[in-house]
């Protein structure tokens, strides 16, 4: 009889907050054993077992219909036979989770192993520590700073390494920006996708006829969220809801924006830009997620070496002058103009590198070397850049027009789809309007 009068943790609190005579209790953040037992029952026996445990524990239904369906759809069998876990007490269908007591909410959830070393540098060599710490927030309502355009500018102005963590990736134009950065400018790109969004990403690749042969400098990998494991051994994985972009290890774009057409045109989103020491937190999070990721497309096992310190010669020789100048012009502000000198808050490392710069008391700088190989080693031979035959103002004006060309034309110029017509389209060479 006493069992029927038992109240679960959530139900008891609901009764207290409804009553005017009960004093507020101290906040309790401990695990809910009744909720754990009910979740285990849902994994092992379905909805009927879930409701039965809720009735026995005197607990309320704490899962929404969407959450309950997700748990049942994502449930996975244990890797080993159930009798090895429970011995003779385990039945033919495994352990009865309602008869097991546990002091933790995730009874068998194991902590992730130490991530593989993606890059290693001393504190003085960390690129993000050379930038001033700042935080900027962008909303969808600001029309002159469209979030989709901000993301695309960030991609087109990255010169060395681009790291992306995303839940859904189906925007073909953003994909073209990434392909152009990797195949035309030698930028190494690593995309970590939520496991649930891999199918949609592959559908997009099939529609535009993109295969592994087009991803020579890109690594597409999948990653899951946290793992919930029941006493019986059945488990399910959560989703990746984190979304951020790290550009050249100097600044981060993070927010609610997903790489979809709807997010770029109708969904309301928020985007934040971080520079300075805050980037280190995203760097560490990416290390852990990369360590548990699995290859999907592109580079399967990138070579993990430390980046070349500034001023040291890279192992694969000198980079071309055009690529070196692009790296020198890299700024932590992806939304500013191309001239870093017009922004006093950004670092300007190429102020005296050009022939038209004013005379300085110090000697001319040494030949440029590749300042940063990225966390996966030297770029592939296909990623090497050659000097441009015309390095005048027109080249600088039209160098970023890939972000403003139609999707089909971008794929054609990347050599990924056959051209519809060989005629030249002069109207596409107009200067972009921001």
Curated annotation (Swiss-Prot):
It holds the Pfam family SACK1. The lineage of its organism: Eukaryota, Metazoa, Chordata, Craniata, Vertebrata. The keyword Protein transport does not apply. It is found in: Cytoplasm. This is Protein FAM83A. Residues 320-332, 348-357 have a biased composition (Low complexity). Keywords: Cytoplasm, Phosphoprotein, Proto-oncogene. GO terms for molecular function: identical protein binding; phosphatidylinositol 3-kinase regulatory subunit binding; protein kinase binding. One of its GO terms (biological process) is positive regulation of adipose tissue development. Coiled coil: none annotated. All members of the FAM83 family of proteins share a conserved N-terminal DUF1669 (domain of unknown function 1669) domain of about 300 amino acids. This domain mediates the interaction with casein kinase 1 (CK1) isoforms. Therefore, it has been proposed to rename DUF1669 the polypeptide anchor of CK1 domain. Residues 76-97, 308-399 are annotated as: Disordered. Belongs to the FAM83 family. It comes from Homo sapiens.
């Amino acid at each position: 009889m006493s069992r029927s009068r038992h109240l679960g943790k959530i139900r008891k609190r609901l009764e207290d907050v409804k009553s005017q005579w009960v004093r507020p209790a101290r906040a309790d953040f401990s695990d809910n054993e009744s909720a754990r037992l009910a979740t285990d029952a849902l994994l092992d026996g379905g909805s009927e077992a879930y409701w039965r445990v809720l009735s026995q524990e005197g607990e309320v239904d704490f899962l929404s219909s969407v959450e309950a369906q997700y748990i049942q759809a994502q449930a996975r069998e244990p890797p080993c036979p159930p009798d090895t876990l429970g011995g003779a007490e385990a039945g033919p269908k495994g352990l009865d989770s309602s008869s097991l007591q546990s002091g933790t909410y995730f009874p068998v959830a194991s902590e992730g192993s130490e991530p593989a070393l993606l890059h290693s540098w001393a504190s003085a060599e960390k690129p993000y520590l050379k930038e001033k710490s700042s935080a900027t927030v962008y909303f969808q309502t600001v029309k002159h700073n469209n979030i989709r355009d901000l993301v695309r500018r960030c991609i087109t102005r990255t010169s060395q390494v681009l790291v992306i963590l995303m839940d859904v990736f189906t925007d073909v134009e953003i994909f073209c920006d990434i392909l152009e950065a990797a195949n035309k400018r030698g930028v190494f790109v690593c995309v970590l996708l939520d496991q649930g969004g891999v199918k949609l990403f592959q559908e997009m690749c099939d529609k535009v006829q993109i295969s592994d042969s087009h991803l020579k400098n890109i690594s597409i990998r999948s990653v899951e969220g946290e793992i919930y494991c029941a006493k019986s051994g059945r488990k399910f994985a959560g989703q990746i809801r984190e979304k951020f972009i790290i550009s050249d290890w100097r600044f981060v774009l993070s927010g609610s924006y997903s790489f979809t057409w709807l997010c770029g045109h109708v969904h309301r989103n928020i985007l934040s830009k971080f520079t300075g020491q805050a980037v280190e937190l995203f760097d560490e999070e990416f290390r852990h997620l990369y360590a548990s990721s699995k290859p999907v497309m592109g580079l399967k096992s990138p070579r993990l070496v430390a980046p070349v310190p500034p001023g040291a010669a890279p192992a694969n020789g000198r980079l071309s002058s055009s690529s070196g100048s692009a790296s020198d012009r890299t700024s932590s502000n992806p939304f500013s103009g191309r001239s870093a000198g017009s922004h006093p808050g950004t670092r300007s490392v190429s102020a005296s590198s050009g022939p038209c710069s004013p005379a300085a008391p110090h000697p001319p700088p040494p030949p440029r070397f590749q300042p940063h190989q990225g966390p996966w080693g030297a770029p592939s031979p296909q990623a090497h850049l050659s000097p441009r035959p015309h390095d005048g103002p027109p080249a600088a004006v039209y160098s970023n027009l890939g972000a403003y060309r139609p999707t089909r034309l971008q794929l054609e110029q990347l050599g990924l789809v056959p051209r519809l017509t060989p005629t030249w389209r002069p109207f596409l060479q107009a200067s972009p309007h921001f």
